[in-house]
């Protein structure tokens, strides 16, 4: 008996490997040939499902965006649980910074937005989501300043292969959000 075809499963497999390839090796590394190789499908399948390389990239980025949106929801719950305290936020963000693949995925969204302006809304979602969740614990301006700082910390971590010092992170978050730390912090 011939195995049943699963066009949507095949398309999804190609998108999953395309997203991972861009995260691992950059926007430019993605080709129809590379996706076919990684997904173990004929080259013609990639051009059948995706009219152009831009179509493939954009569709794969939507996978990354969906994952980022889910992470934002999880982070929002954790921020709420720590009541937006600088100590809690710093601990939460240090955990976030420990996942290099996640940081690279976020950076991919920024790079995509720089390369193709129509993709900027994908990248802007993280900063907007972070600002919104922090606005419950600080002024809108302080929340935005903190979100922008945290964004810079992500780039620092990627460039230096290590996160910032947690104490320095706590102090910066407290200063930006206009709150104070306990004396021993």
Predicted regions and their residues:
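N-terminal intrinsically disordered/low-complexity leader segments
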Residues: 1-9, 181-185
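Helix-turn-helix
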Residues: 13, 17-55, 59
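Short, basic, alpha-helical segments at the C-terminal edge of helix-turn-helix-like DNA-binding modules
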Residues: 62-67
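Hydrophobic alpha-helical connector segments
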Residues: 70-103
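Short alpha-helical scaffolding segments that buttress acidic/His motifs in well-ordered protein cores
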Residues: 92-93, 106-110, 146, 150-153
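Short loop-to-helix capping motifs
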Residues: 115-117
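Hydrophobic/aromatic-rich alpha-helical bundle segments in the mid-to-C-terminal region
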Residues: 119-120, 124, 128, 137-185
């Amino acid at each position: 008996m011939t195995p049943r075809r699963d066009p949507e499963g095949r398309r999804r497999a190609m998108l999953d490997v395309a997203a991972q390839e861009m995260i691992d090796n950059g926007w430019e590394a993605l080709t129809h040939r590379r996706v076919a190789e990684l997904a173990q499908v004929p080259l013609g399948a990639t051009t059948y499902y995706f009219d152009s390389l831009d179509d493939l990239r954009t569709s794969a980025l939507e996978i990354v965006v969906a994952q980022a949106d889910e992470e934002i929801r999880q982070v929002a719950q954790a921020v709420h649980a720590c009541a937006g305290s600088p100590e809690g936020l710093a601990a939460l963000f240090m955990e976030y910074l420990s996942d290099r693949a996640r940081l690279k995925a976020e950076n991919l969204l920024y790079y995509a937005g720089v390369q193709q302006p129509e993709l900027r809304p994908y990248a802007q979602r993280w900063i907007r989501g972070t600002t919104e969740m922090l606005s419950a614990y600080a002024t809108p301006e302080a929340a935005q300043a903190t979100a922008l700082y945290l964004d810079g910390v992500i780039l620092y971590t990627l460039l230096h292969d290590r996160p910032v010092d947690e104490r320095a992170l706590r102090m910066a978050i407290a200063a930006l959000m206009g709150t104070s730390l306990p004396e021993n912090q």
